[in-house]
Amino acid sequence: MKSKKLYSKIVSTLAVSGLLLAGCGSGGDAGNGAASEDQITIDIFQGKVEFNDQFNALAEKYEEENPGVNINITSVGGGTDYISSLKSQFSSGEEPEIFSIAGPSEADQFKEYLTDLSDTKSAEAALEGTLTAVTEGEKVLGLPFNQEGYGLIYNKAMFEKAGINPEEILTYDDLEKAVKTLDSKKEDLGIEAVFALPAKEKWVVGNHLANVYFAPEFNHDVLEAFNAETVGFEKGSEMQKMLDLQNKYSVQPSLSLDYSQQVEEYFSLEQVAIIQQGNWIYPSVYEMDSEFAENNVGILPIPVEGFEGSLPVGIPNYWAVNSKSDEKTVQASKDFLDWLYTSDTGKEAVLNDFKFIPAYEGYDTSKISDPISKEIYEYASAGKTIGWVFLGYPSAWGDDLGANMQKYLSDEMTWEELEADSIKKWEEKRK
């Protein structure tokens, strides 16, 4: 019998209320006198809580190698709005030296604070196309965290038991047939529902789900989306069908289901067969049940007419360096990021501890450690990808769309009203 870690209601509560995780490296205070004057403190504020512990551990190693540098990391996520939290940091005068931004929309919001990073080793090593979203002329305004992909993550053993071959699922009709088969065998499979749709999370539906249907409209180009005055919902009917399918066969009430419950309570404990998520969930699933994570987790593309068999793969976040910091601190921040992505210690952590798909040259990609990331890397290498255009949405428009999707699911808004209101809000934000 496989051993499973008990699902913690405390963890769930933290995720619902939002997560703000602060960590300090081992450098500590420098004390008084000359040592204090020589000490450089780098405060890092970032929005990816999944690797917070591993990131802090790596920062401590950097401090050991560089005793003149003290690194403090604050990770914000869960139900907390990262960008609002970042803006609060700047308005309060507690500006971080390094912070994360997601694509051109956020780069534009913080443009006055962005240091040109084109002279870094990391920028030189970045894979082709990974800097496009944060390049302005000759300037590189951010360095990619990693590559990520998402889709329909499924339980391999359940599919096999239900007689479903995942390789035969390409179209929406194929998927619907598989979902109905799983639903008809819920009792035999021991599941509560086929899906766990966390409709409480606006980003899951308004950013990730919607993106696969908007990407063809903007030629899979985040900058085309960023510069677009309007949006047409050209594949709106497909988007509606996919949202309806997930909701109809989901644990209910989906509108009160959050990310933590979806991943930890339902998928990791094998109470559902499919969830819409990405490779970033792997550390959480592994922590809950390592045997399940290593052997029974796969990923399928969300079906899009004309782009069947393609996964959305992109750069979720970029590191930015605060240009308002003093010259020594800016250089120290650049040095840390270069060490993170180009040193042997950093590269090992990126692959094995962070479990990232690297966005830089010089990595042994055969060592990508988790099965979801391996599959995503294979899709990317084969060119079977869909662009991440949601990073080019007008500021907070993904939340607007997500809120409208919530209204649609609660019968407070028709799909036609959803499209009309969302188009109106896009156009208003572009003025």
Locations of regions flagged by a protein language model:
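Conserved N-terminal structural module of periplasmic/extracytoplasmic solute-binding proteins
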Residues: 2-4, 8-13, 17-18, 24-106, ...
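Short amphipathic alpha-helical coupling segments at ligand-binding clamshell hinges
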Residues: 54, 58, 238-245, 327-340, ...
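Short helix-initiation/N-cap motifs at beta->coil->alpha
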Residues: 75-85, 172-174, 255-269
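Hinge/lid segment of periplasmic solute-binding proteins
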Residues: 102-151, 294-300
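Extracytoplasmic/periplasmic solute-binding protein
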Residues: 141-143, 150, 176-227, 272
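Glycine-centered hinge/linker elements that transmit conformational signals in sensory
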Residues: 179-180, 224-257
